[in-house]
Structure formats: structure tokens, C-alpha cells
């Protein structure tokens, strides 16, 4: 991410957004050290417009139909709780990985606390960002269980319920039957 110029990153990011819009596909973003700039570009490219949100089948969460659904996924989200809430209000979905299990990672815990479960996914980002108790070793897909367990603990609900909801969220986001 620091191996090319910012304007090159931004050009190709905008081009990928335009391509997703042309093909009416979801957008998956890994924003690193560019939180506000990412948000600005998404707004400039009208990713959260009512027209774009109308392209996708309505998703239903525990509280009913999602108020807004832009089919934007912030993969491996590590931004602030406030930024996460802004994204969700605009219709984005956030995905959290192993760092939510780290003892000193209060920022991601606060984000999970603040975001309705219907707007969250769990992931591994394998082979990186390995959750506790395997931190420091290569990550594996099977370790997503530890991320889901931590989300369940934060939300105060069962592992099974959290696993089911986040799995359904993923299926609905990617339109998997």
C-alpha cells in the first residue's frame, strides 16, 4: 500500500468502483491508513446513492429490511467506531477479522459494540491477522470461529446465533442462494 503513489491508488480505486457500478456488483474495500479519503471517494463516486442501492434485492436482518443497502463491504475494517457508524448509516457492511480478539484492540471492540449485527461479517484475512489464541502463527480459515466467538461475547449473544447471523449476512451480501 505504500509502494505506489496515492494518485495511482485513487485512479484504480475509482475505476474499480465504476466497473462495479457498470456491472451492478458489490464493492469490497480494504482501506488501510486512508479512512477519510476512502469515504470521500465513495461519496464522490455516488456509491451510496438511492439509485445504486435500488439495484440489489432487499436484505432482511433481525430488525426487518435493512434501512439502506449499498452493497459496499469494508473488508478487515479497522477504522473508528464513529467511522463504522457513518458507513452503516450510508448502507455499508463491515467485516472484522482476528484483531478483534487482541487484548489491546479496543477500537475494533468498540466498533462491534456500536454496529448492529445485521451489518457485520466475520473473516480471517488468512494468512494474516491471526486471532488469539493462534496470534503470531499463519492464519487459517478455520480460525474464523475465534473471531465469531469474540463478536458473540461483545454482543452478549450465543456463538451459534452469531455464526448463523454473520453467515446469513455473507450469503445475502454476495447474493448466494
Question: What is the predicted function of each stretch?
Answer:
Residues 19, 142-177:
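Mid-to-C-terminal alpha-helical segments outside catalytic/metal-binding sites
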Amino acid at each position: 500500500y505504500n509502494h505506489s503513489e496515492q494518485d495511482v491508488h485513487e485512479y484504480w480505486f475509482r475505476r474499480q468502483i465504476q466497473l462495479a457500478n457498470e456491472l451492478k456488483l458489490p464493492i469490497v474495500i480494504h482501506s488501510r491508513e486512508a479512512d477519510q479519503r476512502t469515504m470521500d471517494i465513495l461519496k464522490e463516486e455516488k456509491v451510496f446513492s438511492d439509485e445504486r442501492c435500488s439495484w440489489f434485492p432487499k436484505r432482511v436482518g433481525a430488525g426487518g429490511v435493512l434501512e439502506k443497502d449499498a452493497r459496499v463491504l469494508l473488508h478487515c475494517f479497522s477504522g473508528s467506531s464513529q467511522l463504522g457508524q457513518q458507513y452503516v448509516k450510508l448502507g455499508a457492511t463491515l467485516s472484522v477479522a482476528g484483531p478483534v480478539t487482541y487484548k489491546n484492540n479496543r477500537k475494533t471492540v468498540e466498533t462491534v459494540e456500536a454496529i448492529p449485527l445485521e451489518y457485520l461479517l466475520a473473516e480471517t484475512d488468512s494468512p494474516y491477522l491471526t486471532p488469539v489464541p493462534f496470534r503470531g502463527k499463519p492464519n487459517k480459515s478455520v480460525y474464523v470461529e475465534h473471531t465469531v466467538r469474540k463478536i458473540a461475547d461483545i454482543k452478549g449473544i450465543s456463538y451459534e446465533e452469531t455464526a448463523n447471523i454473520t453467515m446469513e449476512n455473507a450469503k445475502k451480501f454476495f447474493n448466494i442462494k
